[in-house]
Design a protein with these regions (language model features):
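Short helix/loop capping segments that flank catalytic or ligand/cofactor-binding pockets
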Residues: 22-23, 53-55, 93-94, 128, ...
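Beta-strand->loop->alpha-helix junctions that form or flank phosphate-binding loops
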Residues: 9-18, 69-74, 157
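Cysteine-nucleophile active-site neighborhood
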Residues: 88-182
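Internal gly/pro-rich beta-alpha loop/helix module
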Residues: 1-40
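G-domain G4 guanine-recognition motif of GTPases
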Residues: 13-21, 46-50, 188, 226-227
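Phosphate-binding active sites in nucleotide-utilizing proteins
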Residues: 42-45, 49-122, 126
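Short, structured coil segments at secondary-structure junctions
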Residues: 6-8, 64, 147-149
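C-terminal and late-domain segments of enzyme folds
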Residues: 58, 67-69, 73, 167-234
Length: 234
């Protein structure tokens, strides 16, 4: 029927097999509800309006020791063990939503009180001090500027270029332990440490600057990476 109606040659149809094929970003996000009575760790994930690369979070749903809690930007954050800020199709606009709803204030308070935070791609960019978008790749000048303030929880600055970086990566992780990891990059922004001599900030990978973490004295951490698929390495 498909070939007849569309004129496109069809060899066959593959059924969707749960836990084998990755789900669609937005549709699956609305359907997933996890109730884990024996969970030891609660991970809260900010449900950004323009969330992307939802498959980054798939590994957590198969862990019996983890309870996932989705947090809308206008909801109470609570006190999760870890907070994840995922990727976004439009980082700056989603950052504006966090500011308008007061979620950014909650995140900063959570960090100040010893909360653990990890950002993926756009989430990493939001954690930084500033985001500059001169080519309007992630924003538009209707917001009034090409320079936007981040959450200022990591001492990094991000500039969005004209070319989107898409690359498969194999890296050697240096935190929390040395390990070989695989994943991919897919982003416009390039981030740099504001002070490269800051000994409190650890590069997540030995050979490239695509992720950093601040391991604080109270053992809590704030970090992030551009590497999608990082949690599939275990």
């Amino acid at each position: 029927w498909i070939e007849k109606e569309t004129g496109i040659p069809v060899l066959g149809i593959l059924p969707w097999l749960k836990e084998i094929f990755p789900p669609e970003d937005s549709l699956d996000l609305l359907e997933r509800k996890q109730v884990n009575q024996i969970a030891e760790i609660e991970i809260a994930i900010i449900k950004l309006p323009r969330i992307s690369n939802f498959s980054d979070l798939d590994p957590f749903f198969s862990e019996s020791s983890i309870q996932i809690k989705w947090i809308e930007p206008d909801q109470d954050l609570g006190k999760p063990d870890v907070l994840i800020i995922p990727g976004s199709k439009q980082t700056i606009k989603d950052l504006e939503i966090l500011n308008k709803t007061g979620m950014s204030t909650q995140i900063k308070a959570y960090a100040k009180n010893g909360g653990n935070i990890f950002g993926i791609c756009g989430g990493l960019q939001m954690l930084g001090k500033s985001l500059k978008d001169p080519h309007e790749k992630e924003s538009s000048n209707e917001l009034g500027s090409y320079l936007y303030m981040g959450l200022n929880l990591l001492p990094i600055k991000t500039t969005f270029g004209e070319i989107k970086r898409t690359k498969q990566k194999e890296e050697i992780a240096s935190w929390p332990e040395v390990a070989n990891v695989k994943g991919f990059e897919m982003h416009y922004g390039e981030s740099d440490l504001i002070n490269k001599t800051n000994s409190d900030i650890i590069s997540l990978f030995k050979n490239s600057s695509i992720g950093w973490v601040h391991q604080k004295k109270d053992k809590s951490f704030i970090g992030g990476t551009y590497l999608h698929g990082i949690f599939e390495n275990d």
